[in-house]
Amino acid sequence: MTSADQLLHAELPPRPAVLTALNDEIQSEEPDLNRVSDLVSGDVGLAAAVIKTVNSPYFGLSRQVASVRQAVTFLGLAEVFGVVTGACLRRSFVSNDPMMEQIWDESAARGASMRRLASELHVLAPDRAYTCGLFENAGMALLLVHAPGYAHTASQAGDGMALMERERVRYGVDHPTLGQALMRTWGLPEELALAVRQHHGLAQLDDAEMPLLARQLVALSTMANAALSDERADWESNRALIAHIVEAAEEQLQRLFDELATLDPMRN
């Protein structure tokens, strides 16, 4: 059996070099857009993944982009960094199990949906919402690669809370904890890592001791996950609280929810 210590330390992939280089450039006094574009375009597979993601319906661009440079121009540095982070995350875990593709497809749809909600509601930076959505199930990808029998364990669970309990019993750690640890390893903001850790913890939504940004991210996650699935009980029972946390009217949230529910996450 894979130990919790192994999963939390030895099995966490290091931050990709391209992310470190991108972050250094973006945080410089005068970021060079051409340098940013060149860093991403230097990896053909990464560039293709970025362009494909940016052209998805969730990003709502008025026209398709054909290059990384165009993506940088239309979205800005912060959002492109988020998209590159997502592409690197997907490449960090490789498995022939069909569950892996499902994890990443759902993560891409969730991240883009949370980004869209953040953008429409003007409640927090869209790139942060996007990144948080991508990492929510990153711990599942790690378990699928390194934990024996994980696909079967996951298939036997019902909702997210039941899955977490099964993970803790069998592997000594759950996927939100692993996702949080990975975000910290990659140097991502602590509020985002906390939101990933708590994304199944709806009881934390009205916890004043939890940072507001983290609660807002959990709220958007709850909304996005419900719109992308048939499991809508959490959204429906917490709609008023979610509206309060993101400072929006329930009618506006319902309209956005309905729009998300009609989008095909795999359409490009």
Model-found features: residue ranges?
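Terminal helices and disordered tails flanking the catalytic cores of nucleotide-processing hydrolases
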Residues: M1-A4, S237-N268
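Helical (often loop-to-helix) elements that flank the catalytic cores of nucleotide-handling enzymes
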Residues: A154
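Conserved alpha-helical "signature site"
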Residues: M1-A151, M161-R232, P265
